Every structure is written in C-alpha cells, then in structure tokens.
Amino acid sequence: MSALLMLCAVLLLLGTPSRGARPWEPCTDLRPLDILAEVVPLNGATSGIRMVQVEGVRGLQFSATEPRTTSFPASRIFSSCDFFPEEFSIIVTLRVPNLPPKKNEYLLSLLAEERDTLLLGLRYSPTQLHFLFLSEDLAGAWQTRVSFWSPGLMDSRWHTLILAVSQGSFSLTTDCGLPVDIMADVSFPPTLSVRGARFFIGSRKRTKGLFTGVIRQLVLLPGSDATPQLCPSRNARLAELSIPQVLKRLTGKPDDNEVLNYPYEADMKVTLGSRPPCTKAEGAQFWFDAAQKGLYLCAGSEWVSVLAAKTKLDYVEEHQSLHTNSETLGIEVFSIPGVGLFAAAANRKARSAIYKWTDGKFVSYQNIATHQAQSWRHFTIGKKIFLAVANFGPNERGQEFSVIYKWSPRKLKFTLYQRIATHSARDWEAFEVDGEHFLVVANHREGDNHNIDSMVYRWNPSSQLFEANQSIATSGAYDWEFFTVGPYSFLVVANTFNGTSTQVHSHLYIWLVGAFQLFQSFLTFGAADWEVFHIGERIFLAVANSHSYDVQMQAQNDSYVLSSVIYELNITAQTFVKFQDIPTCSALDWEFFSVGEDHFLVVANSFDGNTFSVNSIIYRWQGYEGFVAVHKLPTFGCRDWEAFNTTAGSYLIYSSAKEPLSRVLKLRTG
Ligand SMILES: *[C@@H]1O[C@H](CO)[C@@H](O)[C@H](O)[C@H]1NC(C)=O
Ligand SMILES: *[C@@H]1O[C@H](CO)[C@@H](O)[C@H](O)[C@H]1NC(C)=O
Ligand SMILES: *[C@@H]1O[C@H](CO)[C@@H](O)[C@H](O)[C@H]1NC(C)=O
Ligand SMILES: *[C@@H]1O[C@H](CO)[C@@H](O)[C@H](O)[C@H]1NC(C)=O
Ligand SMILES: *[C@@H]1O[C@H](CO)[C@@H](O)[C@H](O)[C@H]1NC(C)=O
C-alpha cells in the first residue's frame, strides 16, 4: 500500500508533457485488471473459446475462427483517460506446446485499429519471449522489441511469467525464479495513447500467429511490479494474482512432491568478471559477462548462453550529410584491402565522385568525368580492382559508351581501363561462373526504342579485356542481378518499359552449357531493381516496382503507388513463388542487411505521383509474418540504398535523384 502511494507521488512530481498541467490521475483502476476475464462470458461458453483441463488445472484455449471474439476495446479498462501506464506488470499463466522453428504466437496485443498499428504486444517463439511496444519521437514511429531468452517455456507444462516494465527496465520472472533484467536504451513511452485501441487475447487480430497453447491467467497490474505480491509461492508455476471465475476450481490436487522438488534458485551463484572456468565443480553456476551483457550457465564443461548477448537494431541516427557534386543516382560502397573503404557516387552532371572513409566520414577522394552516370559496379579479377560506370548519356561528341576503370596501386587512383559501347546504360553487374569473369550491362534504350539487346561480356585472360559473349533481349532494362543457388548460376533483369507499357515481364535466366537461358518470367510494373537475399536456407528475390503505366489505359492506370513483390524459391518446384506484397511509392531500390541475428529490408521510395518527399521504410524479418515495417525515414527522391560496416559499427547510406545530398545513417544497436 505504501509503495503504491509513493509511486503515485513520484508520478505526480514528474508529470508528463501531454497530460498538461492537470494533476496526475491514473487512467485505470490500480488494482489487478483481469484481462482474460474480459473475454470470458460468465458461463464460459462462447464460440472461439474452449475450456480445457491439464495437469488438473483449468485454462482456456482459443480457436482460429474469429480473433475478434477474444478482443475488447481498451476503453473498457481505461475508464478515466487514454494513457497506458508508464510502469506496470503483466502476469501470465500458460501452458504452451513446442513450437516449430520460426513460428511465433501472440499472447496479447493492443492494436490501434485505425492505423493498424501494434501499440503493445507479447509474443513468443520457440526460444524467446518478445515484448513489443510502439515508441514515437520526432524521427518517426518505432516498434521496439525486448527479447528474453526462455527456451524452457515450451515444455507443455504450466508456467507463470511476470513481466515488469518501468521506463527502460524490463524484467521477466519465470515461476518465481530469479528475475532476468534487460536495460534497454529505449524506454517504455510515458504517454502511449490507447484511444480507439483494442486488446486482442491470444492473437494480433489475424488468425496467423494465433496462440495454440492454454492460458489460465492474464492480468495487467498498473503502477507496480507484481512479483512481491506473487512470490515466493508454494506453487510457483501456478502463482495467482487474479483468474477468471470459471477457471477457479482446481479439480486435481497438484502433486506436492513435484512442488517440493522444484529447483528453487535461491542459492544460485552468479560470477562476474572475465570468463571463469567451467568444470564439474562449477556445475549449475552462472556467469554474467557484464561487457557483453550475456548470462551463461555452466553445464557439463561448457558455458551455455542463457540470456543471449546479442546485438539488435534499435534505431538509426543521422551520421553524415554528404553534399554531392550533383544528384546521385547510384552509390557503390567497397573496400580496397590495405587502403580503406570507399563509396563511388554516380552523379547526374559532368563529374562523379569517389569518397574515402576518413575519420568516420566520407571525404571526397577522386572525381571522374561521367555522362549522366547511373551506377557504379566494383569487382575484382585476381589482384586487379575495377570500377565500372554505367553512362546514360552520350559524350560531347555524341558517342555513347560506358567505362571500366582500374585501381592503380602506384597512383592510388582509378585510371581508365576499357571503354564499351552501351545504349543509355543503367547498370553493370559483375560475376564469376566456373572460374571465368563476366560483366553484363543493362542497355535501357537506343533513341526511342526500349526493346533492344543488353550484353554479357566475358573477360578474356589473354587479351586482358572484356569481350562480347551473349546478347539478351531486354525492354528498358534497368538492373541486372546475379546469384547462385547450389551449383546453379542465375541472372535476373528488371525490364521497365516496352515503349507502350510498364506492365512487362522481367526475366530470370539460368546458366546452362555456356549461355544464359530463360528460367522464369515475372510480371513487373516499371521494375527498377532486383535484390536477392538469403535467410537461413531460404532464398528470396525482391523486385522494386516503380510505375504502372500503359499508353492504352493511361487514364485508369497511371500509378506510382503500387505493390513491390518478394518471391521465395521453392526448391522442389524449381520456381520462385510470391511470398509477400509490399506497398511502395515508385520503389527504385531494395537493400537487404543484417544486424546480429535480425534481418532487414529497406526500400527506396521516390515518388507518390505528387511529391518526391516520401518516406522510405525499413522492414524487419519476423518469420512467419514476413517483413514488417518498423521504421519510416523521411527521404526526398530516394534512389539507392547501401549497407556497410566499419570497425565502428553498421551504417546505411542513401542517395537522392532529386537533390545533391546523400545521407549516411548509423544503425544504433544494443
Ligand atoms: C508492351 O506490353 C504491353 C502489355 O504487356 C503489350 O500490350 C504491348 O503489345 C507491348 N508492346 C510492345 C511493343 O511489345
Ligand atoms: C561465352 O562464354 C562461355 C564461357 O567461356 C563460352 O563457353 C561460350 O562459348 C561463349 N560464347 C560466345 C558466343 O562467345
Ligand atoms: C492496373 O495496374 C495494376 C497494378 O498496379 C494491375 O494489377 C491492374 O491489373 C491494372 N489494371 C488494368 C486495367 O490494367
Ligand atoms: C513447393 O512446391 C511443391 C511442389 O509443387 C509443393 O508440394 C510444396 O508445397 C511447395 N512448398 C512450399 C513451402 O510452398
Ligand atoms: C555487417 O556486420 C554484420 C554483423 O554484425 C553482418 O551480419 C552483416 O552482414 C555485415 N554487413 C555488411 C554489409 O557487410
């Protein structure tokens, strides 16, 4: 009681900006709020909910038919105002089966339905319990995820979890054991508005990710940590704060021996400092690695990670505004061993610039004359280092060619190596097949004709030059991407326009007996980029669709806001199948990157039909949910994204096709 009063006093003193000068008052009752009881009718009978009894203990199971039947408006418990408490705990008693890998299930979600935004969520995967919440600041809205390593949860036995949240401190207590604390550098927001929001129990509104286990207790305790109220408990796995009336009767008697045998962790030893030895004598002891924030258990003779010391992406911060010679259509980041990290910018006007990473910033290093340069490609052949530029425009004498430059280790500059005749070149791709080196150019158009050949060139080791090897018919080719799957080599082209329509097929080719042959075609809409990436064993191909336009149907169908598509390779069927549609605004580029064990895609959104000021979006891989938007970045005519690492951390750089300004962003990891 007195602790609660003190808390109220503290909240009173701090106040919160958006609640104005009004005295602080809690938005809800400060007693335990039985969220589960809100969705259970008193007689226990409703479609979508079933009562089951396991180990002599009653719980509820939800069915996939209608997540809405297990939801209720937040206003039902937020009776006096609309703010989620800044400090609270959530108490859950549940019994969950083993989940297949990659599967995730929601225990609870709070959704702002109009915006379809997850305000708060609790979900678990085979090894982790994730607490998600929305934080908003001037830079945009963020979904933050705090993850607890909890592989012991999925053993088909009852467990009681207490998640206590207070600003940046997140603490999880399992079965009244030792709490695991995570200090995050993103705090739970002091003013999370729940106006118009809805609680969903056992789902996040969709049938996908529906909770398949049994739930007995789900309580929100505003204002305080429930642990002292529940623990220690004689029956820690079923410690109870509040459960719905219908679940109250325990028919079977819990096995007393089981309770007594439960390993209380009271005499658990945690060692700090550098890695201590782990032998039989240290068995079952813990070591906390303070530097990496990892908690390890000595099991047998090895330290086993309990609370994983992993890096995760928290947010991005602006690192450098890079003022460029002119608008930048493409950026290529590469390193030269022993020299450093470079970024080549393809600039629209007469000169393109190469920057070198110096004292944590890109600094101008070399300028090269180019003609409406569209992109650069870095590649190596043996010890030789090359950089090829795709020139879109002709030179002063009306000649059209693109140029390969070679790094001179003596001059420490790139020098002209070979000119190749091209037609409004958009992109170069470099690759190796069976030990031979190739380049392929995307010829966009010749005069007004977009239906022309693009060309594959082979490196001739005797002449030490690239020579034409295969021509491939393309329609307004914009981008080539090479990748391999096992022993097979693939090349995919983004075809933009065939003279009358942007709704054309982009083609994927496979290398068979010395040449590329058609493997699969995809209907694309002004395709500007293909990005290939792997997540574990899975292989994905994402296309950036920039424009839907057709001369014949101009009026009905001239749109920049359309879906870009992610395909996944089905190895059995030997074909890429649609995996996910993502709405984009004239998407020009996809970039895939990883931070720790998390995977992300960022899209260059460039135009919505009216303005070039559109947000580019970072998506996070969330397993069965696919890619989920986690961050918006205001961009202007965004054209190209690149991810790179230095010893100081991970970065993204993006260019603008509409202003002479590129930006370097640093990925904040925790
Ligand atoms: C371009 O594509 C459209 C739609 O696919 C098709 O109707 C039209 O005939 C094509 N035009 C040419 C010149 O291939
Ligand atoms: C292209 O290169 C491959 C690999 O060296 C070779 O087998 C093939 O004959 C070449 N084709 C042409 C037309 O030069
Ligand atoms: C208009 O474009 C969309 C793709 O953005 C496509 O799905 C639809 O079929 C097109 N409609 C017509 C009439 O071509
Ligand atoms: C892959 O294709 C095979 C054969 O068409 C099909 O049976 C299987 O369900 C597909 N796998 C996935 C994951 O879609
Ligand atoms: C950067 O480093 C991370 C490891 O933290 C790695 O997963 C990622 O692939 C690297 N990215 C690039 C672009 O090299």
UniProtKB/Swiss-Prot annotation:
Q: Which gene encodes it?
A: Tspear
PANTHER family of this UniProt entry? THROMBOSPONDIN-TYPE LAMININ G DOMAIN AND EAR REPEAT-CONTAINING, THROMBOSPONDIN-TYPE LAMININ G DOMAIN AND EAR REPEAT-CONTAINING PROTEIN
Q: Which residues are glycosylated?
A: N498
- Keyword Manganese (UniProt): no
Q: Specify the protein name.
A: Thrombospondin-type laminin G domain and EAR repeat-containing protein
Give the classification, highest ranks: Eukaryota, Metazoa, Chordata, Craniata, Vertebrata
- Answer yes or no on keyword Signal: yes
Q: Where is the Laminin G-like domain?
A: 59-278
Question: What is a single Pfam family found in this protein's UniProt entry?
Answer: EPTP
Q: Name one GO cellular component term.
A: extracellular region
Species for this entry: Mus musculus (Mouse)
Which cellular compartments is it found in?
Secreted; Cell surface; Cell projection, Stereocilium
Q: Give a brief account of the tissues where this protein occurs.
A: In the organ of Corti, expression at postnatal day 1 (P1) is restricted to the basal region of the stereocilia of inner and outer hair cells (at protein level). Expressed in the organ of Corti at P1 and P7, in cochlear ganglion, stria vascularis and vestibular ends at P7, and in inferior colliculus, remaining brainstem, cerebellum, brain hemispheres and retina at P1, P7 and in the adult. Also detected in adult liver, lung, kidney, intestine and testis but not in heart or skeletal muscle.
EAR repeats mapped onto the chain: 314-359, 361-409, 413-461, 465-513, 515-571, 575-623, 626-669
Output the InterPro entries linked to this UniProt entry.
ConA-like_dom_sf, EAR, EPTP, TSPN-like_N
